[in-house]
């Protein structure tokens, strides 16, 4: 993805701020685990406190030099909060499946998640803005940066990018089936887990696209759903 350091060489130290207390056996604090979730998650949710009230917004992100890069507008209240020194909490979550237990209490989900605590710092140097924007674009669609027009000097000035170090981060995952107690295993209720994943539909061309411009090959790397079977026709006798 957009990493420039070896994830095996940098680990998160689990401070009390990020240490997982509920189901701690599902937690990981190494950078490889944190990076893997961030790279797979299409976007993240960023939380801050504004006028004494919590605010959470979804944002596009990328990874660069041990930091998470966030892309938004200079006018966004979230970035004004960050400029004023407000700490941020960032989460990214992937739904991997539904877990159906035999009792109402034992329903759950399989997931991969990351939580990050820190402060956001504005990226202002033109070269760093370009590198940060490349990280965000390549996270969205790998291979896209090489094909599109690069930002102009004016666009670089107008682009709002912020970085949050990954020094305080934790990953947490759940996989597998239901954990029903032995007493429930005899109940006549279906139990198990249903895998889930994000899939994409067929590309739809923008209005005004000149004839002959086909979808790029890298779009074929996106996961797609299996084609639906043709409808079964019936005839009345």
Task: Map each language-model feature to its residues.
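Short N-terminal helix-initiation segments at or just after the protein's N-terminus
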Residues: 4-10, 32-35, 53-67, 99-113
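An N-terminal domain-cap segment
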Residues: 14-69, 80
């Amino acid at each position: 993805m957009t990493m420039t350091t070896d994830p095996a060489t940098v680990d998160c130290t689990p401070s009390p701020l990020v240490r997982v207390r509920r189901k701690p056996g599902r937690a990981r604090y190494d950078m490889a685990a944190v990076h893997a979730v961030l790279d797979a998650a299409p976007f993240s949710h960023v939380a801050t406190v504004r006028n004494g009230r919590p605010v959470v917004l979804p944002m596009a992100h990328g990874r660069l030099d041990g930091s998470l890069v966030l892309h938004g507008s200079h006018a966004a209240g979230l970035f004004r909060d960050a400029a004023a020194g407000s700490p941020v909490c960032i989460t990214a979550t992937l739904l991997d499946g539904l877990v159906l237990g035999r009792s109402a209490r034992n329903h759950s989900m399989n997931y991969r998640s990351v939580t990050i605590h820190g402060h956001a710092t504005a990226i202002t140097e033109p070269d760093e803005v370009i590198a940060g924007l490349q990280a965000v674009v390549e996270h969205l669609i790998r291979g896209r940066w090489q094909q599109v027009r690069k930002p102009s000097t004016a666009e670089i000035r107008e682009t709002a990018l912020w970085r949050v170090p990954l020094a305080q981060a934790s990953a947490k995952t759940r996989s597998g089936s239901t954990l029903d107690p032995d007493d429930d295993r005899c109940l006549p209720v279906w139990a198990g887990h249903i895998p889930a994943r994000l899939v994409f539909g067929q590309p739809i061309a923008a209005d005004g696209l000149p004839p002959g411009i086909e979808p790029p090959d890298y779009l074929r790397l996106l996961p797609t759903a299996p084609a639906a079977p043709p409808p079964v026709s019936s005839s009345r006798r």
